[in-house]
Amino acid sequence: MAVQPHPAEADVAAAAAPPSAPLLLEEHGPAGQVLQRCWMRDGVLHGPLEQFNERGGTLMKTHFEDGKMHGVMTVYAEDGKLVQQSQFRNGVPHGAMDTYANGRCISQQMMVDGVPAGQSLSYDEAGQLTAKLYMFDGQVHGPAEFYHQSLLVRKSNYKAGLMEGESIDYDPQGGVVQSCTYRENLLHGPLRRFWPDGELMEEVLYRDGKPVGAPSRYDQKGRRTDNAKATPDVLERLRQLVRGN
């Protein structure tokens, strides 16, 4: 009579068994062209994986370990231009994630266990910086800077994804055009707008996102004007600020 191994002994033997050799698999299109090439081991993806378009151009390259994406993933557009390059660890994004448009980098972000963390940079299609943020637990948290044509136009602060504290807007010459404070994403405190020479133009007090009382307005010589009605020069300056001039 044959002696059956104890179940625990069988489990140990199975665990000690060496993994099988990786098997190459290819998916082909109607004309026989390779559309996907990957490696499998013990029924799961293990090794390089590549995807191609019908002309043979590479669309995606990555790597798997025991069924989980691990390493660098690179994605290309149909014309061969880079779309995204990111790092994975155990199946989730972990490390640098760079995104491209027309071959130019438009965002750079660090990922930690699948969640955005650390510095986040955004660029326009000319490659000029448009935003510099900091992420914590997937939310904007900390100082934030925004740019237009490489010129700083706003400095703000965020807390857990909400604007918090002072926010300052700048003109192309670096002068302050507006300053205000936020509490939990709502205007809270004085909002001040300025003439191009830096003189105070308007001041409005906010509480929990709503104005309190009438605004105080001043002409370019610093003289108080009618609170109930903005003068034409004040209105024109407000229009400029709205347009971003």
Sequence positions of predicted segments:
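Glycine/tyrosine- and acidic-biased, solvent-exposed loop/turn segments at the edges of beta-strands
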Residues: 1-245
